[in-house]
Amino acid sequence: MRILLANPRGFCAGVDRAISIVERALEIYGAPIYVRHEVVHNRYVVDTLRQRGAIFIEQITEVPDGSILIFSAHGVSQAVRAEARSRDLTVFDATCPLVTKVHMEVARASRKGTEAILIGHTGHPEVEGTMGQYNNPAGGMYLVESPEDVWQLEVKNVDNLCFMTQTTLSVDDTSDVIDALRARFPAIIGPRKDDICYATTNRQEAVRSLAADADVVLVVGSKNSSNSNRLSELAQRVGKPAYLIDSAGDIQESWLQGTQTIGVTAGASAPDILVQQVIERLRLLGAEGAKELIGREENIVFEVPKELRLEVKTVE
């Protein structure tokens, strides 16, 4: 058996920034640091930060006065921001800048009274934060997940509509929903480029190439990671068995029976150490070598807030 590695895979710039914000806050201010929701959707990352003194909460009422609070990479609603401002808290925002871009699109629509339709997954924290940027009762904010949702949707004014998307969706599925929106509402206005982020798009392209050459695909990522789930689904859609795994310990030998080539990739919130552990586990099971495929180069970096840059640490 041989191992093929998707390229790119693993951490994106937004995840890297979010984790760095928590790590630097811990270095500067010391534990405990409170984080609203899991900073990124990866069990290993969250457990590691928890061991260092991060406390993950869902309600700001759980945070004591005078504490440090960090918003997760998924973003928060205007109501959550207002609640945090009303408290004696020092707040750092780890929202991915590409999610913030979508927030600004929604806020702009809200100010204009333009009805807004978000393509996204119900219950996902990014969706909750994005929907929570709209507060104009004269307009409206709607969530759709599928073309069927679009055809059932009723709006106030079909001539005053715009749409935006969650950043971690399936590129193919989203294209189908956008086609339905344009067919149902011909006057609808969308972003110049859809809001699915570069990392999501690149990793889906990479897993498509990987699946073409692999007999089975292993996706390193947690079950609550939207982008990791999309990678597994995409590999299955092109006809290859695919398994979403949190760690090397999840691998079942039965998955590898009769396989010559094992494809390995990782979601945008999965650290490389987990991929290396998967490679080691596969070698113990008889795989030889690990070849990385040629892929799209990524060199995007998002800065942490200036208060957390190491060269300006002033708190003892």
Swiss-Prot record:
**Pfam families for this protein:** LYTB (PF02401)
EC class: oxidoreductase
User: Where does the source fall among the domains of life?
Assistant: Bacteria
Q: Which reaction does it catalyse?
A: isopentenyl diphosphate + 2 oxidized [2Fe-2S]-[ferredoxin] + H2O = (2E)-4-hydroxy-3-methylbut-2-enyl diphosphate + 2 reduced [2Fe-2S]-[ferredoxin] + 2 H(+); dimethylallyl diphosphate + 2 oxidized [2Fe-2S]-[ferredoxin] + H2O = (2E)-4-hydroxy-3-methylbut-2-enyl diphosphate + 2 reduced [2Fe-2S]-[ferredoxin] + 2 H(+)
Q: Name one GO molecular function term.
A: 4-hydroxy-3-methylbut-2-enyl diphosphate reductase activity
Q: List the disulfide bonds.
A: none
A GO term (biological process) for this protein? terpenoid biosynthetic process
Q: How is the cofactor bound?
A: Binds 1 [4Fe-4S] cluster per subunit.
Q: By its UniProt entry, which CDD domains does this protein fall under? A: lytB_ispH
Record: residues binding [4Fe-4S] cluster: C12, C96, C197
What EC number(s) is this enzyme filed under?
1.17.7.4
Please name the pathway.
Isoprenoid biosynthesis; dimethylallyl diphosphate biosynthesis; dimethylallyl diphosphate from (2E)-4-hydroxy-3-methylbutenyl diphosphate: step 1/1; Isoprenoid biosynthesis; isopentenyl diphosphate biosynthesis via DXP pathway; isopentenyl diphosphate from 1-deoxy-D-xylulose 5-phosphate: step 6/6
Q: Enumerate the InterPro entries for this protein.
A: LytB/IspH
Q: Which UniProt keywords apply?
A: 4Fe-4S, Iron, Iron-sulfur, Isoprene biosynthesis, Metal-binding, Oxidoreductase
Q: Indicate the residues that form the catalytic site.
A: E126 (proton donor)
As cofactor, the record names:
[4Fe-4S] cluster
Positions of dimethylallyl diphosphate binding: H41, H74, H124, S225, S226, N227, S269
- Signal peptide positions (record): none
Which PANTHER family would you find in this protein's record? 4-HYDROXY-3-METHYLBUT-2-ENYL DIPHOSPHATE REDUCTASE
HAMAP family in alphabetical order: IspH (MF_00191)
Function, as annotated, reads: Catalyzes the conversion of 1-hydroxy-2-methyl-2-(E)-butenyl 4-diphosphate (HMBPP) into a mixture of isopentenyl diphosphate (IPP) and dimethylallyl diphosphate (DMAPP). Acts in the terminal step of the DOXP/MEP pathway for isoprenoid precursor biosynthesis.
What protein family is recorded?
A: Belongs to the IspH family.
- What protein is this chain from? 4-hydroxy-3-methylbut-2-enyl diphosphate reductase
Q: Which organism is it from?
A: Sodalis glossinidius (strain morsitans)
